[in-house]
Amino acid sequence: MLATTRMPAFADDAFWAKAGEPYKGITLRGVSESTPSSNWAKDVIAKEFTEKTGIEIQFETTSWDQMYDKAIKDMEAGSGIYDFVYIEQDIIYSYLSRDFLVNITQTLKDKPDLAAPTFNMEEFTTFIEYFKGKDGDLFGVPMEAFIKPYLYRADLFADAAVKEAFKAKYGWDLAPATDHKQYREIAEFFTQYGQDNDLELWGTTVQASSGHPASFYEFVESIAPTFGVYNWGLNTETWAATVANGGTMNSDKAKAALTWWIGNLQYAPPESTSSTWDEVAASFSAGRAAQALVYGENAAWIATDENKSTVVGKVGVALPPLEPGVLEEAESGNGYIGYYDGGAYGIPHSSKNKEAALLWLQYYSQASVQTDWAVNAARVTHKATYDDPRVQEQDTKTNGYYSLMRDKGHLFGGAPNFPFHGQLREAIAPYFYDAITGKLTPDQALDQAAARAEEELTRLGYRKA
């Protein structure tokens, strides 16, 4: 724990003014993906930080791929363009293996005058553990964390005529799907319902961009686990991917998962084969789908912001549909039911303003700024945030999104600890694109992806031929 005492607000302000004095007038440059969380940090929290410290922040929010390209090229070259970078949970292990990041724990020990009295690692949720190195030191300070739940149109699911028609056709009471067969039947029903009633409505979304890693991530992080396939289908002891060598990437479960997912495209809006996480949220918020797996960072605005969403007050939230046994595996710690996403800001070794950047990382981590951030961006990094009355009010408006994350978040998992994350993704994602376009069948795609994965992991030195 870096700090154990809390100070009155005026004392807090005095700390920031004094700590920022040596760096007053300098400009910190940061790069992040343009997400609800980062945009709130840029538009609100960064301005407060500047007012209290005199340190300016030039905050670049851009697309996911551009964000990574800019940050990695800067850190590889050591050019020092950026003083802080966004670190998504799934890439932290690659950054640590390449020694890109400043050790925050050690720096605060070495420079105690920079340690803010309002920065307390004990206040964070367990999500902070993802950003620690092998010795337990912190290399990134979380700024967002959220699950990827199942959203559904609560108004449609509660409509008496809809419920009657659904039960007449399928023989069970319409409710959020608990397994994949139910999900498919709901998708089929509402797609037909949209056609029959001349509505721009389909039964589901699919994050199936045929040329963007978003589709790969949807499958390995959100779909495959619900069928009982974890860690991308890799055997984490031998780094095998094929069933023949002890992996599960091309197992029967994995093939059933990919077949089901690709099959959902016939019940999804036409934009689905060009949809990343952003387009999925846009499709659902426009009322174009009856159900969807949506990154939680979008849950709040979809359910509450009438300026951006047409389904305000009409959104329900639930756990993803699961195959038998998957929930029990997750509850016992031997699996997970979906993706626990999020990110942190970290300081590159190449930064020319490390001390000032460290103040910024601590500033946005204060308990005092968490409530507004959570309400507006559906992210929670501090345990106490869930108990705040305003967050509880927003929980009601979102039909229980925050309480679902609090109570069931432990069933979700972050990305596996793969230092080769990026290399392997690039090697095997094209097979998933080919399955989406129909160039390969799901079975062919997984057989070829598994073989290519073993080839790549052998080349990288992880798997022995």
Report residues per predicted region.
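Short, well-ordered beta-strand elements
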Residues: K24-P36, I55-E60, D83-F84, W360
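Short, polar/charged alpha-helical segment
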Residues: A14-A19, P36-E56, D155, I428, ...
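Hinge/lid segment of periplasmic solute-binding proteins
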Residues: F10-P22, Q89-P149, F219, G316-P321, ...
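Extracytoplasmic "Venus flytrap"/periplasmic binding protein-like
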Residues: K47-E123, D137, A160, A165, ...
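Glycine-centered hinge/linker elements that transmit conformational signals in sensory
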Residues: Q182-T191, S222-S274, G316
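Long, aromatic- and glycine/proline-rich binding clefts that accommodate carbohydrate-like moieties
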Residues: F10-W16, T27, F131, V315-E331, ...
